[in-house]
Swiss-Prot record:
This is Galacturonokinase. Keywords: Acetylation, ATP-binding, Calcium, Carbohydrate metabolism, Kinase, Magnesium, Manganese, Metal-binding, Nucleotide-binding, Transferase. Sugar-1-kinase with a strict substrate specificity for the alpha-anomeric configuration of D-galacturonic acid (D-GalA) and ATP. Involved in the biosynthesis of UDP-galacturonic acid (UDP-GalA) from the salvaged GalA that is released during growth-dependent cell wall restructuring. It comes from the Eukaryota. GO terms for cellular component: cytoplasm. One of its GO terms (molecular function) is metal ion binding.
Amino acid sequence: MSWPTDSELNSIKEAVAQMSGRDKGEVRVVVAPYRICPLGAHIDHQGGTVSAMTINKGILLGFVPSGDTQVQLRSAQFEGEVCFRVDEIQHPIGLANKNGASTPSPSKEKSIWGTYARGAVYALQSSKKNLKQGIIGYLSGSNGLDSSGLSSSAAVGVAYLLALENANELTVSPTENIEYDRLIENGYLGLRNGILDQSAILLSNYGCLTYMDCKTLDHELVQAPELEKPFRILLAFSGLRQALTTNPGYNLRVSECQEAAKVLLTASGNSELEPTLCNVEHAVYEAHKHELKPVLAKRAEHYFSENMRVIKGREAWASGNLEEFGKLISASGLSSIENYECGAEPLIQLYKILLKAPGVYGARFSGAGFRGCCLAFVDAEKAEAAASYVKDEYEKAQPEFANNLNGGKPVLICEAGDAARVLL
């Protein structure tokens, strides 16, 4: 594996040793990779079937048990120091606690990046996990990749969970941690996303496509027997970095999907079922889709067509057919634009540029599509040429955004990654 490097690990350990006064050899490091979703865009929150894999970039959290209940955190990317205790009861952001006070909101807390650490404690407390040890930790993300549509938030949440569990000698399964990270984002932060991100980060294996049913939580690691050609993952950044929780578009789309499900279930005599699209049979959708308002019809069409693309994509990956896999990715991108109606103009331009780049099998938005980056699968031998082409064309299309991107690197060439883990 090309990430993390020995140099990166050593730097993290030195920072924690300096903070804690402990020997560098005592420092443990959580490796929490970022994820991409080749197929399965925007359907995890509806119980759909999704695919994902991690990349060789992500979050590193060096830590030692604090020896008491204190949590002390610093970050390579963000200012300030986060300090609190694991025996403090954490409450969802904005909700009043028993004393009438409220948990600090992200806009008011000095070190807002610490909200995910508090959220991890909230999730573990909510799950009746007994936390007696805090951590002294140093957090470092891959430069320029936060808020880029690669689920850095889920990776951070997973990192804090694994560190706290390790420090407290808790045995927790990946499936349980998927639920705990969901509690951070849904319960603590109020974000209405699904479980794709944390599932990919916790379940992926190098070289495999993670295939997951978000209704049953069943998952499969699909190994490609022999790909036709080596591939790389291209990440092209738009320059839009607005945090997901401040954009009403995401939660609005979730509500629209639920409303579409409600109409279809009522029309088919199944109104007692939870209004999520996974509870609507495809035949029911075909029979009653004409009853949906135009906007709701588009959301439902994206869900059902994307589910089918995931199924076909699994078959293409398992047979080593990258060209077919790529075509499905591009079709997913088009449906995200036309049916799910997400993607600001810079992202749409990036998507179109990637489709014309040399060696690209397929491309689509990464993340929610309201900010961040686009991803592409590309022939390994043509990855450099593709990156150069995308950089040049995007600079012409969006010079203001392109000139302020990712430390001068608007396009990154990545490889597949592995699951989140603790290095002792």
